[in-house]
């Protein structure tokens, strides 16, 4: 928190970043805000670039636009021949559009290519106090740095490319404070799943959330990105964490981060954008970190989640008819019975990756549970680094060998099995322990059944063949 000068109005982190980016507020219309960074990928950008070509427009600020290929790319091969006809068309179209409009592109052959929300921060493209947009719902990831980051639609992608601005209504503010410290075996993924379980998948609708408290402050930048990544899963517009020394240490020296005198000036500004003492939030949610256990989803949205030492809930215990019906529908799809201990649920697929959990810290955590063990009979497990940099670092540390020797498949960077948009997908009836962010019906493939967990929990499930409580011997 920062101290407010006498007679000044106390503001939240979000309010400060918002106010600094309002370009104009036309009467009777939504405010226009400036966009500092625009990230694009092969799926939501083709129509936007086509619109510019038809209108004869150029990019307003090509140096502030960064592109990569991630959603449709193969994690088995870097060859274009490995792609489906549609995927190949999309990546080739992105390459041509970037060439035509002068956009920096990290293509499938670039050593820094990767998932847009992994490579952006690690290159220093993301930093505090900025507004960042991308045609992807998990853009909130970048809020871990104290940036205002959110996903936009294809028509908005075109608008930002052309004007470097966007019309936006100001959101309400919510503070989610996680007090105290978590116990061993509890990760950032467990924290955010517990939050969503508490407020529901629509509890944050209409808000920009600021995550704070000792448990959040104790997280690494990788952990904070995991938390902010799933802000959208509670319905929030964006999630943010106030920048601090952990943030500055992470950014120092990265390719696109400020340098020299600009660095000192930037840090001074970043330190000043924290929420002021006395700032009022529209809503406040509190959790005790000590109460959070390793989490595991049982249904078909991230809010349908319980602790690993719990049981599948019974819809009959739910008083709200709508919620009860939703629970019954979820259990029918997921193929579970009320009262089943979570540790009795067997799996046959494991996915460690996605923009939620594919960073080096995530892979290290998973490797602890893979080392010296073997993937259980009948289980297929894949590990997909989030970027070329993550892959190289993991291989330098020997993590790839740990996974391969245990029977995991070691893949190339990409979005992979998070969504059924490439050649990594589940078959009908498969049950997967996944470190991704969505467990919707068919998300990983038609008829697939997804359980969201942390990387450590996923790796442990891979070797056990079922979910286990990693806080205990197994």
UniProtKB/Swiss-Prot annotation:
Cofactor note: Binds 1 [4Fe-4S] cluster per subunit.
Enzyme Commission designation: 4.2.1.33
Taxonomy, superkingdom: Bacteria
Keyword 4Fe-4S among UniProt keywords: yes
A GO BP annotation: L-leucine biosynthetic process
UniProt keyword Heme, yes or no: no
Enzyme class: lyase
Cofactor: [4Fe-4S] cluster
Catalytic activity line of the entry: (2R,3S)-3-isopropylmalate = (2S)-2-isopropylmalate
GO terms of molecular function: 3-isopropylmalate dehydratase activity; 4 iron, 4 sulfur cluster binding; metal ion binding
The protein's role, per its UniProt record: Catalyzes the isomerization between 2-isopropylmalate and 3-isopropylmalate, via the formation of 2-isopropylmaleate.
Family: Belongs to the aconitase/IPM isomerase family. LeuC type 1 subfamily.
Subunit structure: Heterodimer of LeuC and LeuD.
Name this polypeptide is given: 3-isopropylmalate dehydratase large subunit
């Amino acid at each position: 928190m920062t101290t407010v000068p006498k007679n000044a109005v106390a503001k939240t982190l979000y309010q400060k970043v918002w106010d600094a980016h309002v370009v104009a507020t036309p009467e009777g219309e939504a405010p226009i805000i400036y966009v500092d960074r625009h990230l694009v990928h092969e799926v939501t950008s083709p129509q936007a670039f086509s619109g510019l070509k038809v209108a004869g427009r150029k990019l307003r600020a090509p140096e502030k636009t960064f592109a990569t290929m991630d959603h449709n790319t193969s994690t088995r091969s870097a060859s274009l021949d490995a792609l489906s006809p549609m995927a190949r068309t999309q990546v080739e179209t992105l390459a041509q559009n970037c060439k035509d409009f002068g956009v920096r592109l990290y293509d499938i052959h670039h050593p820094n290519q990767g998932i847009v929300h992994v490579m952006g921060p690690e290159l220093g493209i993301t930093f505090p106090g900025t507004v960042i947009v991308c045609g992807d719902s998990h853009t909130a990831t970048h809020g871990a740095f104290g940036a205002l980051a959110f996903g936009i639609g294809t028509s908005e992608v075109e608008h930002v490319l052309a004007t470097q601005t966007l019309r936006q209504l100001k959101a309400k503010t919510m503070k989610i404070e996680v007090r105290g410290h978590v116990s061993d075996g509890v990760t950032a993924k467990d924290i955010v799943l517990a939050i969503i379980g508490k407020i529901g998948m629509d509890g944050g609708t209409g808000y920009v959330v600021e995550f704070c408290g000792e448990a959040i402050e104790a997280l690494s930048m990788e952990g904070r990105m995991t938390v902010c990544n799933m802000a959208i899963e509670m319905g929030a517009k964006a999630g943010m964490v106030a920048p601090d020394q952990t943030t500055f240490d992470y950014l120092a020296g990265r390719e696109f981060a400020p340098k020299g005198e600009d660095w000192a000036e930037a840090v001074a500004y970043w330190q000043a954008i924290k929420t002021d003492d006395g700032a009022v939030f529209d809503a406040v949610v509190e959790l005790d970190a000590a109460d959070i256990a390793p989490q595991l989803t049982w249904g078909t949205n991230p809010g349908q989640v319980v602790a690993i030492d719990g049981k599948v809930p019974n819809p009959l215990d739910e008083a709200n008819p709508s919620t009860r019906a939703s629970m019954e529908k979820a259990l029918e799809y997921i193929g579970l019975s009320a009262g089943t201990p979570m540790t009795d649920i067997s799996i046959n697929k494991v996915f460690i990756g996605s923009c939620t959990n594919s960073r080096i810290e995530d892979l290290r955590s998973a490797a602890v549970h893979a080392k010296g063990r073997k993937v259980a009979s009948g289980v297929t497990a894949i590990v997909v680094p989030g970027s070329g940099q993550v892959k190289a670092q993991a291989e330098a540390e020997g993590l790839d060998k740990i996974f391969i020797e245990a029977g995991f498949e070691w893949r190339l960077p990409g979005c992979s099995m998070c969504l059924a948009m490439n050649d990594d997908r589940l078959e009908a009836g498969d049950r997967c322990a996944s470190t991704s962010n969505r467990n919707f019906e068919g998300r990983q493939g038609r008829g697939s059944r997804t359980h969201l967990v942390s990387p450590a929990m996923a790796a442990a499930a891979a070797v056990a063949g079922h979910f286990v409580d990693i806080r205990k011997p197994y």
